[in-house]
Amino acid sequence: MVYSTKLGEIEITDDQIFVFEEGIPGFEHLKKFALIFPEETFPIGWLLSLEDSHVGLPVVDPKLVRPDYDPVVPSEDLEKLGVSNQDELLFFCVLTIPPGKPEEATINLRAPIIIRQNTKKGMQVILENADYHLKHLLSEEMERAKSMV
């Protein structure tokens, strides 16, 4: 199906659509999202609302930015998605990219988007790990990742 999104008219398939029963913080009223990875922005993907064409969040696999990223999802959140083991989940972190200042981009490692692919459900969780913050400077994290290789 073709949807109007923040990125324009986009063909979206059923396997790209996920339901966030609780919405996501700041957008609790929005429940239906698509996760896409356009060639022109890869490895950055987009979590796009299918209910409000103005809402779209840039996301990335946190392991690309912080190879030692090791989140522990609270058990109550695992229960909400119907899993007992977080290995069944996909993790994405939201990027904030100030207009005209990509060098000031940050990644939110504290509140990842988690997705259970086989049930098409997702949610944003708040981790208790004090090492992860809402705003990590992306350039610093990328330098740190290079030094780990």
UniProtKB/Swiss-Prot annotation:
It is found in: Cytoplasm. It comes from the Bacteria. Pfam families: FliW. Interacts with translational regulator CsrA and flagellin(s). Acts as an anti-CsrA protein, binds CsrA and prevents it from repressing translation of its target genes, one of which is flagellin. Binds to flagellin and participates in the assembly of the flagellum. PANTHER family: FLAGELLAR ASSEMBLY FACTOR FLIW. HAMAP family: FliW. Belongs to the FliW family. This is Flagellar assembly factor FliW.
